């Protein structure tokens, strides 16, 4: 049978399917659907999904309906004393009246964590989220806060659930998308624009499960300096206290703010927002706002399925999956182009390479179908400009002190190890070698549980020389240098500086090999010492300015940080 005859037969079968759907002429239209259930039948563009937008302006990612609702079975549910229709396509509805449920604190420190955090807040699987959100306004805002300004984003919410629902596992594609699909050829490459137009109209996914209600969302963008000398438990407690204070204030209450909350607010850009109900009533108190949520609920979270799974024609389903794959790759190109532009304006190393990458991205923007070579090129660009999760999440910079004699000289402990993730300072080490003559043995290390081959050649370098007495740390004016590759401690440096033995000049450097990716070549190493108020950051492969370790008659607080910009 010729290809043309096959096409004619497929169109006839498709028309028969359309006519046989339960939403055909004669099906009962739902006059009054349970509030909020309409969101379950609409498509979602996963690249633009912004379920909890930080700002009111912009595209939230919801698209046209992918399924039709009918009410032939006459199912109903009572919401706030009023009866509403439950569509036949909805498998189950639970009307709830839960009290306030407060989420845990979500902390986003790196660009690689944004999609994961947004997926958790929306109740979406992390696997699905790997390709999602990058074209949304909230993603762009967080990306800029983290990569351009070096801030940490924290989120917390109070949730008031009024309804949860599941769509039928036998859901059928709606009449409008089915008719649009019928006009497309079976081969994606024969009409790529037609498939992309379908995606622009109906999206890439739909929610097969959903939770509706009201929410108060708190978001903070906090300067890195705030986190110095605070552990994770202290930070989380302060974020929770700030959240509670702002929620109380926003709902007409009052709150006595602690000094910790005041300090956090002074170091942060904070936004807060109500979703669902008559939000203008929130200022009059929760008792005014909460009763309005049930009939004006917000779609808060859910579980996604692909629209392609609703396509019965296996050939067209495969073509739609290919179209979605390429559509997601186009979104990835746009995201990397935006990130590369940020890098050009914030990195000090590799501008020529970044311009070359930008030119390659401009070429990729013209693609409608991506080859395997294009995908490999995209991955190589991402490897250069995006800080990977293995570094931001599973790498630490560590310092350890060991007392030779009295622990009083060495932070009050015989052995003391202080570690910090990238973009965090270690807690302060209190240098008190003036209290004795035995001193403290000091070492440093970069640790990671996962890395690429070139990272094994990244080194911590430390050098020192005495200023007037060879007893302090060796011959006067002669620098001593020690270094250690990743996952190894440096050799011991014996710190015996005091008025009796003398003073020493100290310097540090993070050494990154030429084979490293661009993000690594733009690492910074920072020191923050209380004595002399010495605080500075230097690029990789550069020594910090000499620090004069006097250790005379006061303790000196010392902190170190590895910064991925």
Curated annotation (Swiss-Prot):
Post-translation changes: PV2 is a very high density lipoprotein (VHDL). It contains 3.75% of lipids. The major lipid classes are free sterols and phospholipids and also have significant quantities of energy-providing triacylglycerides and free fatty acids.
One Gene Ontology term from the biological process aspect of the record: defense response to virus
Functional description taken from the UniProt entry: The egg defensive protein perivitellin-2 is a pore-forming two-subunit glycoprotein that affects both the nervous and digestive systems of mammals. In addition, it is a source of both structural and energetic molecules during embryonic development. The tachylectin subunit (31 kDa) binds target membranes while the MACPF subunit (67 kDa) disrupts lipid bilayers forming large pores (inner diameter of about 5.6 nm) altering the plasma membrance conductance.
Pfam families the UniProt entry points to: MACPF
Name of the protein in question: Perivitellin-2 67 kDa subunit
One GO term describing the cellular component: membrane
Assembly information from the UniProt record: Perivitellin-2 is a dimer of heterodimers held together head-to-tail by non-covalent forces. The heterodimer is composed of the tachylectin subunit (31 kDa) and the MACPF subunit (67 kDa) that are disulfide-linked.
Domain annotation MACPF: ranges: 27-340
SMART domains: MACPF
Superkingdom of the source species: Eukaryota
């Amino acid at each position: 049978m010729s290809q043309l005859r096959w096409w004619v037969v497929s169109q006839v079968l498709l028309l028969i399917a359309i006519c046989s759907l339960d939403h055909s002429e004669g099906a009962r239209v739902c006059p009054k659907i349970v509030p909020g259930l309409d969101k379950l039948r609409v498509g979602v563009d996963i690249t633009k999904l912004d379920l909890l937008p930080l700002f009111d302006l912009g595209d939230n990612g919801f698209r046209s309906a992918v399924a039709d609702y009918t009410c032939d079975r006459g199912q109903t549910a009572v919401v706030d004393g009023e009866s509403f229709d439950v569509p036949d396509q909805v498998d189950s509805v639970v009307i709830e009246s839960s009290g306030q449920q407060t989420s845990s604190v979500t902390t986003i420190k790196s660009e690689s964590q944004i999609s994961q955090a947004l997926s958790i807040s929306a109740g979406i699987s992390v696997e699905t989220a790997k390709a999602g959100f990058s074209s949304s306004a909230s993603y762009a805002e967080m990306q800029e806060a983290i990569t351009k300004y070096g801030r940490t984003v924290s989120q917390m919410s109070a949730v008031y659930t009024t309804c949860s629902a599941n769509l039928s596992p036998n859901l059928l594609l709606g009449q409008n998308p089915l008719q649009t699909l019928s006009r497309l050829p079976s081969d994606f490459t024969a009409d790529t624009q037609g498939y992309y137009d379908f995606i622009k109209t109906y999206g890439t996914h739909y929610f097969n499960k959903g939770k509706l209600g009201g929410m108060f969302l708190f978001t903070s963008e906090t300067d890195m300096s705030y986190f110095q000398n605070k552990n994770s438990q202290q930070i989380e407690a302060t974020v929770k206290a700030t959240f509670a204070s702002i929620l109380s204030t926003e709902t007409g209450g009052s709150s006595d703010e602690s000094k910790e909350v005041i300090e956090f607010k002074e170091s942060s850009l904070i936004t807060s927002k109500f979703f669902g109900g008559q939000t203008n009533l929130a200022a009059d108190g929760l008792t005014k706002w909460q009763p309005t949520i049930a009939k004006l609920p917000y779609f808060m979270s859910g579980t996604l399925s692909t629209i392609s799974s609703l396509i019965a024609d296996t050939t067209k389903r495969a073509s739609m999956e290919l179209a979605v794959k390429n559509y997601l790759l186009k979104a990835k190109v746009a995201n990397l182009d935006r990130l590369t532009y940020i890098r050009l304006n914030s990195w000090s190393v590799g501008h020529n390479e970044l311009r070359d990458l930008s030119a390659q991205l401009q070429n990729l923007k013209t693609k409608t179908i991506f080859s395997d070579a294009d995908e490999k090129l995209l991955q190589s660009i991402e490897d250069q400009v995006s800080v990977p999760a293995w570094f931001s999440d599973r790498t630490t910079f560590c310092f350890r002190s060991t007392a030779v004699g009295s622990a009083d000289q060495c932070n009050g402990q015989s052995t003391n190890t202080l570690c910090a993730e990238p973009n965090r300072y270690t807690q302060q080490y209190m240098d008190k070698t003036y209290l004795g003559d035995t001193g403290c043995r000091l070492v440093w290390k970069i640790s990671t549980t996962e890395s690429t081959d070139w990272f094994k050649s990244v080194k911590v370098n430390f050098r020192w020389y005495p200023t007037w007495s060879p007893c302090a740390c060796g011959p006067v004016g002669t620098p001593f240098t020690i270094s250690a590759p990743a996952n190894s401690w440096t050799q011991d440096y014996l710190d015996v500086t005091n008025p009796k033995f003398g003073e020493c000049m100290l310097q540090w450097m993070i050494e990154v090999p030429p084979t490293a990716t661009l993000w690594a070549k733009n690492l910074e190493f920072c020191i923050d010492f209380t004595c002399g108020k010495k605080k500075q950051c230097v690029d990789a492969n550069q020594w910090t300015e000499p620090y004069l370790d006097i250790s005379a008659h006061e303790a000196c607080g010392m902190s170190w940080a590895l910064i991925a910009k």
